[in-house]
UniProtKB/Swiss-Prot annotation:
InterPro entries (alphabetical): Smg
Lineage: Bacteria, Pseudomonadati, Pseudomonadota, Gammaproteobacteria, Vibrionales
Official protein name in the record: Protein Smg homolog
Organism this protein belongs to: Vibrio atlanticus (strain LGP32) (Vibrio splendidus (strain Mel32))
Family, as annotated: Belongs to the Smg family.
Gene expressing this chain: smg
NCBIfam families (UniProt xref): PRK03430.1
Length: 158
């Protein structure tokens, strides 16, 4: 599954501070040895390329800043992928200033870029972490999100 590959790559190379300059062929071979399917590997690598492309100013035309008082209206396609719990979590992260509206849109873009029929809150948390890691200047938000990901809900957050 594509999400499993993304989590594997994130934990192995990014989160562990391993060598980030890995040859793509070596990476594909490693993922094949780890038991992932070739087709899923290509999809995951393409997904990561699209994530990196969101940083390109030419590609940000669809992802623009909007007012903090504006309300995000989801399309029917987005609603079918991002359930109410996930949408509520995105709103919560905006309210506590972990996500900006721009980063929220990047997250939604990457969620919609997944080829999966099953998507739940834990998957969303990983996607948010990956997006925050990819956007420079969000170290504090990344740390907050990391704490939310690695700490199981232990009551109400203050």
């Amino acid at each position: 599954m594509m999400m499993d590959i993304l989590m594997y790559l994130f934990e192995t190379y990014i989160h562990s501070d391993s060598e980030l300059q890995v040859d793509q062929d070596e990476l594909e071979d490693e993922l094949l040895r780890a038991g992932f399917h070739q087709d899923d590997i290509y999809k995951a690598l393409h997904w990561l390329e699209d994530l990196a492309a969101l940083q390109d100013t030419e590609n940000q035309a669809a992802i623009t800043m909007c007012s903090n008082t504006s309300m995000r209206i989801y399309t029917s396609r987005e609603i079918s992928r991002i359930n109410m719990e996930c949408r509520g979590f995105l709103l919560f992260l905006e309210q506590i200033n972990v996500l900006t509206t721009e980063i929220r849109e990047m997250v939604i873009d990457r969620v919609m870029g997944l080829e999966t029929s099953e998507f739940e809150l834990d998957d969303l948390k990983w996607i948010i972490l990956m997006v925050l890691f990819n956007v420079p200047g969000n170290e504090s938000a990344y740390t907050q999100m990391e704490e939310l990901l690695y700490t199981k809900e232990q009551g109400i957050l203050h």
